[in-house]
């Protein structure tokens, strides 16, 4: 279930302030954030944001295709290592 259109997209204030400050000065640096729930805005394009996945900060370079998605979509929290193998060969 998506967010109501009358509410509009959400982005944490502290993250938006950091992005706007970097856009004004023209600097490019990695921004660490724990805000996986924030929507990616067009102002974010070209910046690298390190999104926390529960263990470490995963660097995510923002491109035009990512606008409208959430930051958490690009930093997976679980690592799938595959299902258990078939032990038919060893049972004989």
Curated annotation (Swiss-Prot):
It comes from Geobacillus thermodenitrificans (strain NG80-2). This is Small ribosomal subunit protein uS19. InterPro entries: Ribosomal_uS19, Ribosomal_uS19_bac-type, Ribosomal_uS19_CS, Ribosomal_uS19_SF. Protein S19 forms a complex with S13 that binds strongly to the 16S ribosomal RNA. Belongs to the universal ribosomal protein uS19 family. The lineage of its organism: Bacteria, Bacillati, Bacillota, Bacilli, Bacillales. GO terms for cellular component: cytoplasm; small ribosomal subunit. Keywords: Ribonucleoprotein, Ribosomal protein, RNA-binding, rRNA-binding. One of its GO terms (biological process) is ribosomal small subunit assembly. SUPFAM superfamilies: Ribosomal protein S19 (SSF54570). GO terms for molecular function: rRNA binding; structural constituent of ribosome.
């Amino acid at each position: 279930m998506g967010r109501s259109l009358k509410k509009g997209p959400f982005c944490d204030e502290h993250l938006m302030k950091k992005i706007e400050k970097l856009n004004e000065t023209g600097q490019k640096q990695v921004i660490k954030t724990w805000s996986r729930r924030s929507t990616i805005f067009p102002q974010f394009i070209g910046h690298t944001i390190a999104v926390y996945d529960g263990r470490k900060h995963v660097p995510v370079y923002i491109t035009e295709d990512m606008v409208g998605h959430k930051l958490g979509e690009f930093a997976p929290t679980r690592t799938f290592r595959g299902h258990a193998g078939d032990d038919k060969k060893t049972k004989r």
